[in-house]
């Protein structure tokens, strides 16, 4: 195994011509997290509060693949509107296989908008630009087709779905995405193992999806889906928000266990610890 290599970069989207890449780098210190999969950002760069900026911090662990990385996601000149109002102006982003990207910024900067646009949420209209996944233009693809390609979005506020249990929901999704029928008992064993790893109450699997779940249980349910579905690109929208210290530790560990040289993460968070 090769020695760990850390690469980092920062990009942003804002209308302030005086903010430059060098200014961003000058105020950030990167440290490899124990285990080699995450970056601790010592402090944020100092910016004018009257500008809404999106910051993209990328950490890459190359200990498995040397210096070779394949492009997984590419966003080109993306403009996104919601309700006729343009929220994103000319976003460019490239995520290679094996990378972890952390998006930070003030509330209302458009962080969640970017993830929903990548996922193909019809409420977020792409008025200009393109989204490519594994070299294929997916700008016009529906959300379910993007999911089948291996794109996963964990919601900031997960919704409940009455009428379908958590187990059946994840099993059906796994079957649809993989194209292989999930045998009942092996799947139950996998579900039990993943739930134990998240310190989830075993009854959650038999309950309707997120119905009556606490805020922490809903966030863990999203990570449970990610662990079992094993997407190529996992986008997590403030999965750590509203969690207590122990839950943040558990979720962080599961994210670390999920990530490897064959998948990528795009995270929105306000916590350095995640």
What are these regions (language model features)?
Residues 73-75, 88:
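Conserved structural motif at the start of ABC-family nucleotide-binding domains
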Residues 104-106:
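The feature captures the beta-strand-to-loop junction immediately N-terminal to the Walker
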Residues 130-146, 210:
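ABC ATPase NBD Q-loop/coupling interface
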Residues 157, 163-177, 190:
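Q-loop/switch helix immediately C-terminal to the Walker
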Residues 226-227:
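ABC ATPase C-loop
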Residues 238-239:
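Walker B catalytic motif
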Residues 248-261:
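Helical segment within the ABC ATPase nucleotide-binding domain
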Residues 268-270:
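H-loop/switch region of ABC-family ATPase nucleotide-binding domains
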